[in-house]
Each structure stands twice: as C-alpha cells, then as structure tokens.
UniProtKB/Swiss-Prot annotation:
Role according to the record: D-lysergyl-peptide-synthetase subunit 3; part of the gene cluster that mediates the biosynthesis of fungal ergot alkaloid. DmaW catalyzes the first step of ergot alkaloid biosynthesis by condensing dimethylallyl diphosphate (DMAP) and tryptophan to form 4-dimethylallyl-L-tryptophan. The second step is catalyzed by the methyltransferase easF that methylates 4-dimethylallyl-L-tryptophan in the presence of S-adenosyl-L-methionine, resulting in the formation of 4-dimethylallyl-L-abrine.
Gene3D superfamilies: 3.30.300.30, ACP-like, Chloramphenicol acetyltransferase-like domain, N-terminal domain of ligase-like, NAD(P)-binding Rossmann-like Domain, Nonribosomal peptide synthetase, condensation domain
Taxonomic source organism: Claviceps purpurea (strain 20.1)
Residues covered by the Carrier domain: 779-853
Chain positions with O-(pantetheine 4'-phosphoryl)serine modification: S813
Keyword Phosphoprotein: yes
Protein name, entry field: D-lysergyl-peptide-synthetase subunit 3
InterPro entries linked to this entry: ACP-like_sf, AMP-bd_C_sf, AMP-dep_synth/lig_dom, ANL_N_sf, CAT-like_dom_sf, Condensatn, Far_NAD-bd, NAD(P)-bd_dom_sf
Family matches, as CDD domains: A_NRPS_SidN3_like
Gene (UniProt): lpsC
Residue segments, region Adenylation (A) domain: 239-642
EC number annotated for this UniProt entry: 2.3.1.-
Chain spans, region Condensation (C) domain: 895-1285
Amino acid sequence: MNSIKLKFNCKDSLWQEHIGAGDFSFAAIFLTTWGIVLRAYLDTDDVFFEYGLSRCEPVSQRDGIDELVPDRPFNLKFDGSMTVKDTIRRADSVVYGTPLVQDGLEHETHRETDPKRETFYSTCMLFLDGPKSPIDADVVEGTILDDIEFEMKPVVNYDMVVYVLSGKVCYLSYNVTRVSDDQAAHVAATFETVAKCIADVPHRLVQEVESLSQLDVDRLKTWNAYQPIAVETCYQDLFRQRCDLHPNSPAVIAWDGSFTYDELDHFSSLLATRLQAAGIGPDVFVTICATRCRWIPVAMLGIIKARGAFCALDLSHPLDRLKDICDALKSTITITTPTDSNIARKLASTVIVIGGDAPVESDRITPMNDRPKPINGHPTNALYSVFTSGSSGKPKGVVVEHRSFVSSALASIQPLDIRPHDRVLHFSAYAFDISVFEVLTPLISGATIAIPSEKRRKESLTHAVQELGATWALLTPTVARLYDPDEFPSLRTLALGGELAQASDIALWQSKNVVVIYNPAECCPIGVSGPACPADGKFLGWSHTCQRAWIVDPRDHDKLPPIGAVGELLIEGPVVARCYAHDPNFSSPDSPFIQSTPSWMLRLRSNTPSGTRLYRTGDLARYGSDASLYYMGRKDSQIKIRGQRTEPGEIESNLHSILSKDKLGVAIVVLELRGSSKIIAFVSKDTGGLGGDSNTVGQLRIEAATEETDVCITKATSKLHSIMPAYMVPSAFLSVNYIPISRSGKIDRTRLKSFALSLPQETLLRVNNGLETGDLPESNEEHRLQRMYSLVLGISRDKVGMESDFFRLGGDSLQAMKLLALAPKEGLTDISYEDIFRYPRLKDLARKASQSVTIKKDGFGENSSVIHPFSLVIDGQSLIDMAAKQCDIERDSIEDIYPCTPMQASIISLAVKGKIMPFLTFGLALRDHVDTKRVKDTWHAAYRANSLLRTRIIVCAETGQLYQVVVGGDIFWDDDECGNFAQPKSGPSASIGGPLVRMKLVEGQLSIAIHRALYDNWSIRQLLNDISGAYNGLTLPSRPSFNCYVSYAARSLEAASSFCNAELGDSDLDAAKYPEPVSQNSHTNFRAWLGIRVFTCQKESIDVLASEFQLAWAMIAYARTNKKDVVFGVLSSGRSNASKDTKEIMGPIATVTPLRVTIDGTQDVGGALEELQYRQEEQAMYTHLGLRRIGQLGRNAAAACQIQTVLIVEPDLPDLRGVWFSNDATLPNHSDADASNYRLTIKCVVGPDCTDIFAIFDHQSLPIMEVKEILSQFEHILGQIHGKEASQLSVASIDTVNFKDWDTLHKLTEMPSVCRNGLLLSDPTILPQGQMKTFSAVEEAAAHCAFQDSLQEASIARDAKMQPKEPLSSADLISEINRYDLAIMRSRPSPESILLSELALTGDSHSSGTHTVFVTGANGFIGTQILRHCLEDPTIDRVIALVRGSSANEARSRTEESARRAQWWSDCHSQKLEVWPGDLAMPHLGLNETHWRRLADRTTINAIIHNGASVHWLKRYADLEATNVGATAQLLQLAVANPRLGFVYVSSGRYTDPNAESEEPAAANVAATAMPYSQTKFVAESLIRRTAARLPHGQTQVRIISLGLVIGDPLTGVVNADDYLWRLIATCVQAGEFNSSAGSEWMPISDVTSTALAIVQTALNPAGVPATIKPITGGLMWSEIWDLVTDMGYDMEPRPESEWMATVRRDLEREQERHPLWTLSHLVESRSQLNTDAGAGPAWADAWRGDEATTRNLKTAFRRSLRFLGEVGFLPGQKGQNTDGEVNGRAFTRAW
C-alpha cells in the first residue's frame, strides 16, 4: 500500500474551542470530514465506513498492532439542510452510541454492490490516539512515521485507510491494486479541501461544503480548456462537396439497387424540387414512411435540400404512435415508396411516392447535375427529429439542427475509424437516432451506405453483411452477442452502443476493431467513443472535439464534484439539440436543457460565450485519470431496452389509463433475464397498498390469478400493442397483493425488482401464462426446435413441448433473431423471421419447417419483351443445320437464331478482312482474399442469364447474310494454367462459328477476350456492374434479350429508311468530304493523338454540350470548305430515346451515323443549338439502320456516308469499382476502336468542369500541324458558342479565324519550347477571350509501339531563354512546375494505346501475380532501409535498385556497402536484388537502352519508389534541377502512362497539413526560404500533386510520403550524422548549453524503420492511403529532446536564445570548418525555416501528430541513436572526451 500525507491543522481552527468545551469529539470532526468526502464521491446521503480508536498511550508503550483495527461501524445519514456543526454533533452521537463490530460480520453486511461504490468498496479511519484530546503533533512526527508501513498490514483488506495521527498529521493509505496514484491524490486533495471548508465556516450547510480541490480545478482547466468545435455549415453543402469530388463513387449499395454520389445527388434534387413546390422550407418537417431500401437516403437528402427537416418513422411501431409523432411535428407531407404507400396515406394529407415507377426515379430528362433552386438556409435550421420515450405517456421529439449534426459527424469520422472506401451497414431501427448517423455520416466522409433488406436484417445479418461487403457496423451488444465474428469476414470495425458492453462481448469480437460509443439522442448520435476495454465494460471513451463532457453534482448542476466522483454527465457544445418538439421554449421546469451558463464554467473557462448549449443527460458517470468517461448508471428510473431509452413512466401512464376503470394499480420494473432486458408489470387490486407502509400491509406475495384479472391484463396487452412499440410492452404481468412505496412516497421499484428476481423464471412465466408443454417432440425438426427454444430462452428442454409457444415462454423479437441465427447450425434453413411470429408453437413451426421446399433461384426474371426462338428467321431448320456445322456443336444445344444488325455486320466484315482486331482483351486483377470459385460461379450465372454472351456468328454461304446463334452450354475457359492467355486467331475463323467470349482465371488475374460484335461501352460496363452485384448476393437484373433489339430494328426498318432519305436525299455530294479523302491505297493504320483541354461549365446536360460541339465542328468544316451543307459522323449510343426495354438491352447498339448540319448565318446560336438537339432526339430513333443501308438509299445518301470525320461525345467515366476486382481496371473502349476507320476522329470526353478534346488521325496523310490548327480553331469557336454571350450571337458572327493569315497568327501565339531532361516542355496557350485554357500534347507512335518510343526519342536541350533566374521567386517556381507539367500530361496514353498494351500484358508477370519494385536512392540512409524492407517482403519477387556507378559491379558494391553500414545485409538478400547503374541527372535516368525499355515497357515494373535526390544546402537550383526535378518528371511519365504502375515519391514536410496545402501560397513560402534544395523538392512534389489530381477516378497509384526528421531505428541506432538534428545536438553538447526558448516547440520525427516500412507498404497498396500525401506522423518537443540528451550523461545548461545564439556564433567563428554546423550555419541564422526560433515560425499542423505509443517508441529510437553517435565518435563517449567532428565509417554522411 502507498500513502499520502494530508494537510490538516485542527489546532489552529475554531474546532479547538468546541473540542475543549466538550461539544463534540476530535474523532467526530474527522469522521464527518471523511463522510462528506465519500458523500461527494459516491453521490449518496447514506454513508458507511468503519473506524478504530487506540488507547491513549504513548506510541512506545503500545503492545502491538492488534489494537489498530477498524472495529466500529460508522453510518451517517446526511441531511443537506443541516449545518456542518450539527452534522458533527450527529456523528459524535454515532461514535459513542455504536457497538463494536463482531468478527467482521457488520463490515461485510454494509459492503455495497452499487456500481457507484466500486472505487470505494471499503474504507476505514484509524485514530492513533484517543478521541478526545489529540497527542502532540511534534511527538507524532518524530516517532510514528517509521512504524506506519508496519501498522498498515492489519488493514490491507481495505481500499483506503485514513490514519489520524494528530490534529496536524493525517495519512491516506491506499491499495495500489484498487486505487491509482492519481486517484488517491485527488481524494487526498478533496479531503484537505473539505476539511478546510468546514473548519473555516462551520455554520454553513452540508450541501454548501466545497469538495472541488484546486488539483481538480487545474485538471479540469486542462481537459476542457478549449470550447467545442462548431461547424457552421449546412449538411447539404458538405454533401455537395463530396459529390463534386467523387461523383461516380458508390454512395449507396442496397438489396434493391445502388446509387453513385452523382445519381443520389440527382434523384434527391428532383425530390427537393417537388418538395419546394409543395411549400417545404426551413423548419418544416416531412416524415419518411418507408421500409429499409435505397430510397431512404434519397428521401432524407431531398428533404434536406428543400431546407426542410425529416423524421424517419419506424413502421414496426403501432399506427397510433406514428400518428402522434406526425401530430407533434405538425407534418402534413410524408414520403414513401410504393410498398408502404397505404400506411403513408393514413398519416399525412400529402403523400409523395418515390422509387419503382414513381416520377422521381423515372424522370431522367432532368440533367444529372441539376439541383433545386436555392432557398436561404442556415446552420441553425432543423435537420431531423427523433422521438424518445417520455414519462408523460407521450414520446418526446428531439429537434436536431444542421450545425449540431454536422459538428458531431465530422468530429466522429476519425475516432470511429470511418474511411472513404468503407461500406457502413445501415442496420439500426429508424426509432433509433443512430439510423440517421448510419445514413448521413458516410455521405460526407466518402463512404458507402450498405443497406440490407428488412428480411435479411432480421433473419440473416451475417449473409447481409457478406453480400453487401460491409466494413463498418454499429450494433447494440445484445445483437452483437448473437453472432460469430468469423461470419463477418468483411467487417473491419464494430461500434458497440446503445447499452453497456460486457467484457464477454468485447472478448468475443476482439478479432475486429471494436469501439464503444455514447451520446444521448439530445446530443446527436455519437460524441463519445474509445477502443473497447475488456477489463472494464463501463468505459465509454473520450469526448470528440465537437463537445465537452462535464461531471456535475447530481443534486445541483451548478456544482462540480471532485474528479473521480460519481456525478451526472453534462454535455456542452454545438451538438446539443435545439429543444423538444413539444417544448420549444423550455417551459417545462424539469427540462434537461440548461439555459444559463453555470458559474463554474465561467470560472474555469473565462472565454465561454453566452448561449453555450448544455444538456443534462441524467446518466451517472465519472472521470478517469485521463479525462475518459465511465458509465455508472442513471440518476432516475429511465431504462434501456435493446438500446432504446425507455421511461417506465410512459408505460405506467398508459397502463394506468387502461386499467384505471378496473381499479387496478400498476408499477413497472426491468429485469435482466436470459441475456436481455425484460419489462415486468406488477398489478394489484389493492390500490390502498400504494399508500401503505410495507411493515403494516405484510409480506409482498403473488396473488392467485382470477378470470377478471386475466381479462384486464389481456385487454391491457392488446391496447399497449396498438399504441406503443413492441419492446415497450411488458413481457410478463404479475398480480401482487399490493404495490410497495418508499419513504418518499414513490413506488419502491427496488423492492419490486428484488421480489421478481427471487422468483424462479419458470414460475414467473407460468404465473402469467399458464404454460402448457403438450406432447414430447418426435421428428427431427421437432427435436431441433426443442433444443433451439431451450438454448435461446435459457430454460430446460423438459419444459419445452409440442404446445410450447415461443413468445409465451418469454421470447421476443430479438430472441427471434437469435433463433434464426441458430437455425442453420441445426440444419433448419427454411425458417423465416415471419414464420416464428406466424407459427410460434413448436409443433406448428416444426410442421412449417418440414413442409418447406427450398426453391433455388438463379436470380433471373422473365424478360418484359419475349421473342420466341427462331421467330425472326424464315427457314429455321436449315439454319440450325448450318449453325451446327459452322459452330461444330450439337443441334440440340442451339437455343435461337436471328439476323445480325447492320452494326454487327460491319464489324464482322472489317474483322474478316483483317482491318480491325476482332477481339478486345482486358484484365481484372482480383482483390486479395477474394473467393475465386465464387467469381467463377458468378460469371457462370451471368453467362447463363445473358444470351448475348452465348452468341456466335455464322454466315449463309448462299446469301452472305450473317446470323447470330445462341447456344447452350457453359462459358469457354482457357485451361492453360501456365502459358499466356491464348489470343483468338485473326481472320475469318476468329469471327465465324467460334466462341466470341473467352476467359481465363490464373493467379488473381481474370483475363477476358470479347468480340467487338457483342458489346458497346455501356454494355461492357453494365455487365461488370451486374456481376459485381451478383457477387455481393444481389439478384442479377432481368434484361431483355438482344433479339428484342433485332426485332425492333426490323420492324422500324421502313420508317428509318424514310427518315434517313428525307435527311440526306438532297445533301451536297461533297458535304462529307472534309478533310479531303485519300485513296484506299494510301490509307495507313498509324494513328496519332493530339489533345487539348477546354474548361466547360457543365450546367447543361451532356446532350446540350454535344450540340455545342457539333455546331463548332460544322463551323470549322464550313470555314475550311466554304460549303454551308456539312455532313460528318456522330457516334450515337442508340439508347437516348429508345423504349425502356431497348435501353436495358446489352449489345452493340451504339453506332456511327451521318449528321447533316446546314449553316444558316441569319440564325442565332441558341436557335441553331436547339435545332441540333431536336435532330439528335429524332435521329436517335433510327441509328440502327447503319451506314451500309443508308448508302443504298440513293446517290446523295451514299455520298453522305463517305464521312471523313467522326465526332464522339461521351462522359469521363470512372474506373469500375467492384468488391472482387481492383479499381484500376482499364476496359476496352468501343468508340476508340471505331476511330481507326476514319481519317479524323474528334473525341470529346466531358468531365465535371472541363472537356478533354482529342484528335485521332492518320498522321501520314494528315499533317500534325494542320490538326493542331484544327484543334485551336475548334477551341476558339467553341469558346464563343459556350460563352455567356452566345445567346446574343448569330451564326454568321461566329469568328472562325482568317486562315490566310493562320501561319502568321500561329507564330505570334506559339510560345518557345525546350526539351529538358528528356521532356518536351511548352507553355500553355491562353486565348484572348479568357474563357478557356488549354494544354497541348503531341504523341506520334504506331499503335503497336504504345507510347514508349516518344520517351526514347526525346533529346536533351536547354534553351538559355528558359534558364530560371537565381534566386527563384514564387512565380518562377510556378512557371517551372507548369513547364514540366505539360510534358507529363503529354504522356497520358491514348485509350487505343492502353488497349493494345493490355493485349501485350496478357499472361505476363502481371498476370502471374509477381511483384517487381524499382527503387532510386537505395544506397542512402533512408533508401537502404527501403531496400531492406522490399527484399524482406514476401510479396515482392524482385527489387531493382538504381545506383550511381561506372559499372553494374561498382553500383552493386556501393549498394551492399550501404546495407552493411546499416547493419542488415546478408547473402540471402542478394537473391532478389538487381542493381542497375544509372544517374538521375541524365536522360532516361542514365540507364542503358535495355534497362530503360524494361522500365518503360509497362510489364516489368509494378511499383516505383522514388527516394533518390541530390541533397545539398549550398548548390544552386540549376545544379540540383536535373536530379531532383527532371528525374521525377521522367518517372512520372511512366506512372501516368501505365495505370498499373504504383508510384511513391519520398518528400520532406512543411508545417502545414500536406493534403490541405495550396500550391501558390506554398510556392511563396518556399521561395522565401531561398533554399534551392527545398525549392527543387517543392517543384517535384507539386508535379506529383497535379498528376494525382488528373488521374481518372479510382486510379490511385500515385502517392507522396512526406517526412520530418528521420532518426535511427531502435535496434541499431544507425543515423546520417550529417543531418541537421545531429549537428545541432553536437553543437550544443560541445558548447555545454542549449536554447531553452524553443523548448515547447514540437518537431515531426520518425525512426527510419517505421518510415521505410510505411513507404514500402504504400507502394504495394497505394489505394490503402486515402489521400495523395501521407505524412509520417509522430514527433518530439525540443524540451523532450534535450531531456533525452542530458539523460545520456551530457551536461548542458539551458540558456535563453540570445545567449545561446551568441555562443554558437562565437564557436563558429573560432572553429569554422571544424564546427559541426559550419556547412549549415545559414540554418542557424534563419531558424524560422525549421521552426526552432520560439514564436518565429508556425506550429506544425495536427496532421503530423502521432499518438502516445509513437512518442514512446521514438524516445527509445532517439536514445539508441544518441548512443550510436557516441559509439562512432560523433558525440563524446561515456568518459566525456571531446569530438573533433569526425565520424568513423559506421555512420552515414553526405558528400558536400
């Protein structure tokens, strides 16, 4: 046991007068003081402890220690209205009126089981002198202290013992296994505070005695020093930001479908528009009446966008309760789905139906990015309401504002470990406020809401989580303990809330990241959380930054108890709700919302603003020593049922109203039975007993049930079910002889609870229900159900028979879920949740289980449009024979035959002639831990469901007609496990008769070859989306077969021909001849790509933008040919205005059709655009006709089909996302393949705020300069059409540029370019209009060469005009970034290049799953550790290190030497290592041609770790540029061109949060440092930031690791002795002093091992790092650093900065080159650059901060590094010898 001396001077106080007068004893004063302390800590007026008195003899004469025992009980009942003096007198009477304790029995009897007493389980007070006259303190202090430890031994069974030695000397002794040192210190301080308070003013009331010590005050000031962080933003603004950032990320994945963020934004905006029209605005409530589905988030967001507030109704609640909620909110509008519309119409006068065929879902005409007209909203507007139980009998509606929820949600994301790619399970009932959190929080964190069906949620949660891929879930402990964590493989984080988690719950789920959460509904769903603590289930965690937690006196919230005391939890901050809906003005006298700021808060935090929101939770809690919170119970009778707050008063109030006519009294208690909470209702006919004394009315007993009572109870139960949720209806009714009351006149629930617990459970239930067991089970099903009933309900099997009713045995809905969870283990898979309620008797449920027949569904529905097999051909039988022969299959396997479409016929013709590759191949890399069998099974299911995948092509020899043949059988898998994926042959046999879909699955790579005749862009993406859904367990959607489209095309052939003839029959014969056609012989397939970017405001739909592009191109053709009749091709999706069935058909519907545009100069631009849009809509009906058939309509139509230019407009689609394949899948692009058939293709890829326009052309027949002019002209014209003043322009007034002077203009606007470090650099062109900026990039390469030749052909040149001046300004830095950035953008590969490269990748190292990592800077201090972790990582097969050296041997030797210096090299490391000699400052990194080709071939390297750099503080920017910037840009070219290539750049950090840093301000700061090295690193890092920002959504392979100072590892301590940190320490050690002014400043520091490991892990899994830049967190304050140095034995004195600087300058001047800081002296003079000047530089952002564990590990590594530096002679050794600055070969250094 440990002891603390208490400061208490009884002799100098007023007590001496009273003691001397005999008013009361010396002991009574101390006993009262300790009693008041316990009263404060335990929150009780009934205090019990024990005490002992010794004889009044000198210490030296005491016989032994037996006299020092607590042999007297002390029980004092405090009355707050009594004075302290009167209370001491009462204590004195207790001292002289109580007998001795015999054998400790009294001691055991008074030990409380109340959880509030757990800290003070037992305490006592021992007096070492008599109770009347204390002995002299001086004698005591001189004689007794040596004996204290010995004399404590007899009382070690107590948690705390107060030794009273005299009026001046007291000691608090405590059991260290039960009481911490910190806790004891606070108790001691409380004792001293109470003692002083009652001594100073003995006439004050007990309730006025101050128990808060100064120690408590200081600690509370530290914990709650800062006000909670409020986010003054509306929710919809945050959601809009997330939509703008990642529009195509999945927002919702549900059992009934899914939404991307863009789609969710679109549908909710449509709903918001309707709600606004209906009058919804700020603080107007709309209810949501719908079962769990994907439309719930749409409803919530629609209401929010309309600036209304929502309340989601729990449809499991009775209709009357739902009506009460609607009435309380004054809601007249409800949103529902078709399934629940009947209920909704009973609740509101206006019902809006969404989902299904409702207008909100089907209205696709509205642009996806349209949002409702803004209405003035404010963060203080109501966001939602949730209803909790109310003691008055009516539920209470909590009104939560935008600022409250937003502040709470944003502050919760990090503590709860919610990540951007998480799938958050939407499980909670809508009566629970957590349900709001589960929907709204993921949508502002970038996560996905995973919504199971109600059936899955109740019956098979494990399957629901697996199917949806949920990674984050929140469950109540009661629900969590129903399941096995192993059945949730996808789940990473489980939050437990709603009720206390037991230690067994936490132990059960320990394989997951388990967090506990807390907050009442009045303070937003979550505001306190922490990692689950198995040792203490009462642990709640810490408050989030959005709120502060205060523990107040439960009797008076204007008073604070001591830290560690049990008190009422009070929450402060913006998270506090506005009010209750029924009490907006806080008129209720017992309102828990505090309206005035308590005085203690103003005292502890003087800057607390007025209006601070405070809420009294009613929960009892206590502080831990680290500001954590522990739940200790309730101060009132409120209870939790299945996580729901329940007021017994509400249940009692309703029961009273029901039973009052029957003159029955009622009372409610809650018992923990069979692992769940049960509500027990006591009823009594003796209403007089309510007011009687239990001693007079007799023993509480069960009354025999009467028929009259049973009727009343049955009536009450039925009525309760109609007005209250099922969980609030009592599980049992007990008829008792009376209802006991307490002394205060209230129902004595404690006695009722004890009485109920004394009854056997079977008796409890039988009393109410008259249990019948019936016959014993016989069948297997009956025995299994008997066992299940017994296990779930916790009763013996012999009590369960055939007549046993699950619910009459005590079951409820929660235990029904448990029964279902157990059913599969018992072999009963056909029982549903509804079945248990429908057939609760065992015999009925067994009969249902035995009669059920499992119907295995493949998930394919009937097509809405059915075309009978062979109905589209005339001679079906002869075609079957022909197909069987050409396909080499049996006749019986042929399911259907129908004609090919014109588009398919054209593709087959080109493929047979060898003009195009018939098959396009792409690969999908499977994610880790994906079930490959499940992947195959899913593809098999899709193959069977989709007839197009089973389609082959045959040709009729007599007519040449092409037909499609649908065959049975299974998918064609390539069984070659070792070799490459065999490419289908070219030529006729590749397209005729054979399978058109082939697949191979080897080592985590799914390779797919699909014929062009089977798909278009929409089809292939939709196919993969469907398969992803099926893999998740969703039903494959039923889609019409492709024969429906063939039938539609045949039926509309005549109408299509008539339309096209009318459109093109009179067109100019030369209308389509731009560019001028070339002869067939001169046509080549060498395609070049040229691109520009224009910034477009996509307020219009993509169709509107398409019309602008079409008009711009028509004006170009007109300007260059002087012909007003213009014809060019457009690629149509074929789905724009087709029927619903046609839109859903998979197949090659997209096709190129001629578009005719007649230039009318008198027409205004707006009119011309409207006409083009109308033509698009009309023409979309007939795109299936095809160019060949159109050309047969006549001479003019045939001429129009000789189109030379095709315009393609398509959205910038993101990479597909799936739970089974990685996000970097590059899909074949049908439009790019078609581009090779035309002389010029203009492809416009429309993004959110810009459009990339590519020209794809044959550069041998169409000069590059001409195409550059065309694109510049296109941009110029488009800028006028798209501009704000376009509506005022006529077509004739559009400036098309005078091309006679084009060459002159081009020379004037062209900026100088240079080729630097192997990169083509040029400045962007800025046009006079100022509306658009472009980048220009030229790539000339044959398709089979991809892009690599352009890299190899780049030459080195430096134009003197482009040489940056020294020193560089911020503008110079931005200019440098721009020039390099243009060259990097040039490396963006064409989709065709990606496609062709994908073909080359099949079967290579990527397919086989091998990993090769390329590392630069591998022989430096950090680089060698990176190399080590790469070589030791089992997932990496080969490591290639680029190292400077004249030969491979020299480079390898340098690499191994560095590894040995770092003390990790062994011969086994050489097996995977390959060293390439090179030089980062050279073109192609100084690699030879072979090595460079391997680096750039997109197959050899999987990841690049770029750590190499020239680190020198004295060189100019120009000297460092090639190595630090040029090399980075060259490597970035490779990363941009290869979506599979991971790229990690190792950089150095700056003060700010690296992911929140803006380029221009950062450039200004870096330029101000005038440090060329830092400037080169900044330029390189900015290039990577820009590159990452441009990457397609989902392509996340480019990352930056940002470092602070790096020290040695904890094992060896090897460091780079040239680092500034060590040179500074050596300087201070040498001077014997350090700068004390900077002691409180913090520096980011990491050890080299953890740093290198983080770099390698990021390279292998860049998608695992959510942001572009990952700072390596952790660090130390300078004071901690100096403590570590001095702890190593170095004597140094703290000095103010001015004195310290003077010493350093003096030493520098004296020693010069020999001084450790000589080469870095400029850093000493400009310390603000490294934040070492107190107050001179900004503090490091919180993003750099680490946790306590990181700090501990850092200190260990720091000590080892210091020891290493002493060992190598850099620092003085243990004997204190001076260092001359020389370091032996064991440390790393730099060549200055």
